[in-house]
Every structure is written in C-alpha cells, then in structure tokens.
Amino acid sequence: MEIKASQVKELRELSGVGMMECKKALVEVEGDIEKALDLLRSNSALKAEKKSARVAADGVIKVHVSENYATMVEINSETDFAAKDDSFIEFAKNIEERLVSKKYLDVEDLKKDVEEDRQKLVQSIGENIQVRRLATQEFDSPKKVGTYLHSDNKLAAMVLLKEENDELGRDIAMHISASAPLSINEDGVDKEVLERETNIFESQAKESGKDENIMQKMVEGKIKRFLKEVTLLSQDFIKDPDISISKLLENSDNEVISFERFKVGEGIEVSSKDFAEEVAEQLNKDG
C-alpha cells in the first residue's frame, strides 16, 4: 500500500516521532492513522522503559508559587544538551503549567499525569527523561514563602517563614541555595550523618598520636564546626557574613518553619567513564 506524505506529516504532528518511524508504523497498519498512533505509543512505552535504566542526572528545576502553596519539581535528562532541546523545554513548561492548575503533594501523581508526554519525549530525544522529585509547601499567605531559582534552572530553594516578609524569604532562599544547609538547627541533623562524621573525626584524631583527652577535644571541636557549617541558623548569612541567619531572623522578629533545596542530579550516582571509554565499549558490543 502506498503511504502518502500527507499521512506521514499528520502522524508526525500527532506523535512527535521522526518521519521514518511514522512511515514504518503506517506501512505496518496499512495507512490507518489511529492504529499507527497506537503502535507508536506502544513502541514509545517500550523504548522509554528500556531507556529508564540509563542514568538521567542533568535537567532543570521548575518553581511555582500560588496564593496558598509553592512547588518545586526536578525534571531530569541524561545530558545538558537534551535539557536545552526545544521539545524538552516544552515538556518542562507544560509541567510548570500543571503546577499552576493543580496542587501536587506527591511526585507519583505528577508522573502519572505526564507519563504519555514523557514517553513521546523519550522517543523524540532518544534519552532517558524522568520527573525525579517534587516538594510542595502550603501556607496561608504567599508573603510567608521565599523562593529562589538560579538563572541556569539547576539550583533552587524555598523557605517558609512564620511571619510575612517576602524579601527576607527570598534572601534566605538564595542563601539556602548557595550554602546547602542540611537542617534548620542541630536537632534536625540526621543521626546517621552525624555518626558518620564523628567516626571520621575520631579516626583523624587517632592518627595525630596525641593524648586521649586532647583527641577528645579535637573531635568535639570538629563536630562543633561541622554543625555550624550544616545548620541554617548557625550559618553566616551569604549577603552579610558578619551576621548569622539566626541573628538575621532575630532582627526581623521572624522564624524559619521549614525549607527545601533542590540541585539537579544531586545524590544520583553517575558513571565515571569518559566518552572515549563509552564509544570503545559500544564498538566492542557491536563487533
């Protein structure tokens, strides 16, 4: 059966898939557009599933603030090149628009809503694309929340204050983005993290060969410095290092209730292979 160029064009516009893939699908289903679209969707799902095993550690972050909630979402691709592709940018924009119309409290709900579009994008770009994580903060006034999104869309933070002060909120959100605190105060530091750091400090102290009481003081000093570095209230304010965040809040008669910080790819284990190694490995497989 002869497949017309107009049919291929129509299917491409509906599916976003390449011309050759569209033509193959139309030939297989004897020119039926609806059946061809179903076939491409099925193939997209299979390809997306195969690619989902590949590491996606690049991408962008989107932030939205409404009258009673703020949301951050991380959308991943395998490479920065793909993250700058027009179709990826459109996918991220569509997600941002969804955040405007619906309050998502669970990333799985968002994933379900965009899964079909994600599969099409995987088919189009040829990379693993994932909606990785989402954070939503609810409040009774948008002036109680501060958000910051870096110009490259790869680093963001949001903070909820006890009292209205959107300028202070933005300053603290910017500080959180840059300084990466683990918690608001010492009580919030994960016990496993503190235990791991303590073990490292103790090993370092033993290597010094000093007396037991001196080693103990060395460990205590390092723990104290560590906690100052990783707790928000103890950190020096990035815009004015002469005061701490605690003092900044005290001067404004305000408190931090909670915060979230996203950095694209943070915590994702990426292979250390360089490009040449990957090419060589692929050639060996093909051979």
Regions found by a protein language model. Give the residues of each.
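N-terminal assembly/interaction segments in proteins that build large macromolecular machines
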Residues: 2-287
